[in-house]
Structure formats: structure tokens, C-alpha cells
């Protein structure tokens, strides 16, 4: 690389697959859902009649832990809000939710709903780079940045920094 390094430009930030919905005791009562991660791991969680949102969340958290799904869940009781998100960024990191109770969670009973994240987009030294989660990779045909990979964890867009390569070592600025 030149002494000043290669510029890193981010035009789109990566996102995690995320699902947010209204959730309270009325919705939780008698609720049954299936939750499937992109790699095929599947769990099913239900609450009996008279079950509460807190009870459902406890069952959901335990099922996710037992199945080692790569998902985070949270419940804001004051806001009546359920949030499920993938722990990793990117378009291939997602999950599917199916609700088996009329008109709640996904809107249609028995119809799976897919949630995907997005990959980072940008360029390295003005050359095209493909995104994979938080990784920008210079295209194989690039003159200066072929196959160069840079992980970006910031929240800014535009020119976000430079990377310098010297004798197969990297120095970040």
C-alpha cells in the first residue's frame, strides 16, 4: 500500500436481523410460536391459557439458551414491546418466526415471516468492495485492494479511515 494507506469508505451500515412487536399479557395468553435460525435450528415456545408476557419471555429465553440459538430477546413491560434480534450482522444471518395464534406477532397465523440483516456496503481506495456482515472485501479484480478484507464496527458513513499494509502486516489509523 502507499504510505498514506488505502481509504475506507462506507456507503451503507450493516444491520442485524431484528423483529419488534407489541407484546402484553393478552397477546401472550395461549400464544405458540416457532422460531428458526438461518442454519435450521428450530424451537417452539408456548404459554397456556392464563399465561403472561413475563412467563412467555422466560420460556422463550430458556428455549433459545437450550438450543444455543444466536439470538437476543428482550421485553419492555412498560412499553409492551418484544424484541428479537440476531447476534450477528448481515444478510445471511436471519431468522423466521411463525405464530400459531390469530392476528398476533406476525400478523398471519401459521405463515412464517423471515427477518434478515443487511451487509455493509462501501469501497476500498475507491475500488469496489463486497460486504459480508461487517466485513468489506476488495473484489478479486481490483488493482490495489484485491481480496483485502477490513472489518468495520463503527457507526459513521463516508470515509471512515485508512488501512496501511506493510510486509503482510496491517496498521489501522
Feature annotation, model-predicted:
Residues 1-50, 62-173:
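Polar, low-complexity export/assembly segments characteristic of proteins
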Amino acid at each position: 500500500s502507499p504510505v498514506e494507506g488505502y481509504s475506507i469508505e462506507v456507503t451503507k451500515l450493516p444491520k442485524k436481523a431484528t423483529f419488534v412487536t407489541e407484546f402484553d399479557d393478552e397477546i401472550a395468553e395461549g400464544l405458540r410460536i416457532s422460531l428458526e435460525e438461518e442454519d435450521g435450528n428450530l424451537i417452539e415456545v408456548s404459554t397456556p391459557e392464563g399465561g403472561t408476557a413475563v412467563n412467555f419471555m422466560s420460556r422463550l429465553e430458556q428455549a433459545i439458551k437450550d438450543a444455543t440459538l444466536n439470538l437476543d430477546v428482550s421485553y419492555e413491560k412498560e412499553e409492551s414491546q418484544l424484541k428479537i434480534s440476531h447476534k450477528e450482522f448481515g444478510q445471511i444471518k436471519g431468522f423466521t418466526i411463525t405464530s400459531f395464534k390469530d392476528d398476533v406477532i406476525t400478523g398471519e397465523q401459521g405463515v412464517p415471516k423471515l427477518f434478515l440483516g443487511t451487509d455493509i456496503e462501501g469501497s476500498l481506495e475507491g475500488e469496489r468492495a463486497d460486504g459480508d456482515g461487517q466485513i468489506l472485501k476488495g473484489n478479486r479484480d481490483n488493482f490495489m485492494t484485491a481480496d483485502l478484507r477490513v472489518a468495520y464496527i463503527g457507526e459513521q458513513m463516508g470515509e471512515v479511515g485508512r488501512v496501511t499494509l506493510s510486509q503482510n502486516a496491517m496498521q489501522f489509523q
